[in-house]
Design a protein with these regions (language model features):
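Structural micro-motif
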Residues: 113-115, 133-143
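Short active-site neighborhood of thiol/selenol oxidoreductases, capturing the structured segment around
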Residues: 51-73, 79
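Structural microenvironment flanking redox-active thiols in thiol-disulfide oxidoreductases
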Residues: 68, 73-111, 122-127
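N-terminal "domain-start" segment that seeds a small globular fold
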Residues: 22-51
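Positively charged n-region of N-terminal signal peptides that target proteins for export
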Residues: 1-5
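Thiol-/selenol-based redox modules, centered on thioredoxin-like
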Residues: 138-176
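Short loop/turn microsegments at loop-to-beta-strand junctions
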Residues: 35-36, 58-59, 139-141
């Protein structure tokens, strides 16, 4: 094998490893931390500010990578299917991605979601929450934020596709 080929293969392997490490990074936030405040445009046409919910209700922030992709479609359909669990627990659900509002409106319409989706097109909120991936979209992460604005539960990666963990966390928060 030529030295050039060995160098090229080594660089490719190192590059792949670097990408895998970056993608595996976890949020820097943890349960008990105050959730960073934000204002984002929603699919309802209104801006949503997290701090407006303080003292009122629990909020579920379901970050997802991209509208119209397999995992994200499954995740948002799951939240819609379980929406009554969140409503019973007094929680407001928001799907958040780095897609623009128009794309999220089409996605929400196609899935017939009753909850708003929020556009983080400038990536600032995803970065604040530590979920922005190097490829420019949010990693799949769900945060349950209580009435006091504190993070009570975090799910990341494949666990965040299912709504059940977040729904159970909302029920626990409601009992406090």
């Amino acid at each position: 094998m030529s030295k050039t080929l060995i160098v090229v293969i080594s660089i490719l392997i190192l590059g792949c490893l670097a990408v895998m490490v970056m993608l595996a990074q976890k949020t820097h936030l943890k349960p008990g931390d105050t959730a960073p405040d934000f204002t984002l445009k929603s699919t309802t046409g209104q801006a949503v500010t997290l701090s407006d919910f303080r003292g009122k209700q629990t909020v579920v922030l379901a970050f997802f990578p991209k509208a119209f992709t397999g995992g994200c479609t499954r995740e948002m359909k799951g939240y819609q299917a379980g929406i009554s669990e969140f409503e019973t627990a007094g929680a407001q659900v928001f799907g958040i991605s780095t897609d623009d509002v128009d794309t999220l409106k089409r996605f929400s319409t196609e899935l017939k979601t009753s909850f708003a989706m929020l556009s983080d097109a400038d990536h600032k909120v995803s970065a604040q929450y530590g979920v922005l991936l190097p490829v420019g979209f949010a990693g799949r992460t769900t945060f349950v934020v209580d009435k006091d604005g504190r993070i009570q539960h975090i799910e990341e990666g494949s666990a965040a596709i299912e709504h059940s963990g977040a729904a159970m966390a909302c029920k626990r928060v409601q009992k406090k």
